[in-house]
Every structure is written in structure tokens, then in C-alpha cells.
Amino acid sequence: MEKKTIRLIVPDWQAGDNPVYYFGAKILQVIAPKKEGQKEITIPVPDDFKPLERENGVTAQSAVYQQVKDTVSAIDKEAPDKIITFGGNCLVSQAPFAYLNEKYDDLGVLWVDAHPDISNPEIYENEHAMVLANLLGAGDPKLSGLVRKTLKPSQVR
């Protein structure tokens, strides 16, 4: 039986407060090879690039929360075995990793980035630097709350 794979496009720019991230996701969507039979899902993200405000110490917290929530819903609806994610910044990984952690008991995550993404609102204001902390249940309390089964530190390298 063939595994179900989805292509998830999340052009989030608010989590990093950088409109260029939006276009990065769109470029990746176009240049990445497509395989027949893989459903492509795009999470709607505003492209007005208006200045963002802080909420609870987090840049655009409500907008970013809604995007992650919409991503969780889209993934749950499709119930894939694999997820290919193209996004503007690191936060787009939260919903896919959280879903896969629920689906697979032995999930391991190799986190490769220029910074560890283990911040919280007391340390840094942009959500893209909190994604791994959110997955571990130690980041932004609002977005960490969207993770139904947190990663254990032993699952992350």
C-alpha cells in the first residue's frame, strides 16, 4: 500500500516579521519537483505586509496562532503518512512535526538551523525562533497549546 504524502505550502512571514519569507515559500513551491498523486495544500496567509504589533510579548501572535491552527486542521483532514512542507520560516514546521509525533511512536527529529529555535516570549519576540520550544511544550504558551503530544528532549538531535 502506497503511503499518502501531502505537499504543504505555508508562506508565513509574520512569525519572523519579514515579508521576504512569504516569497521564499512561493519560490520553493514552484521549483521543488512534484510527484503525481501528492495533494498540495496551501495555508492562506495575508500578503498585505502591514506592520505587525506585539501581543503577549509575541509579534502578531493572533495571526500566527491562526495559521498554525489552520495548518493543524488541514493536516488532520488529510491524515497523511508523510508531509513535505515549504514555508517562509521555521514555525511552519510546528504542525507537521506535532502531527507526525502523534502518528509515529518512534519519531526522531534532526533539527538543523542557524539557531536552536528554543526561545520563548521572555527571550525573543518572533515566533519563528520558538518552534522547537513549542514542540517541547516550553515555548509560547499559546502556540505550545496547539501541540497535542509534545516531543521529549530525547527525540531531538
Where are these regions (language model features)?
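Conserved alpha-helical scaffold segments that buttress catalytic/binding sites
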Residues: E2-R157
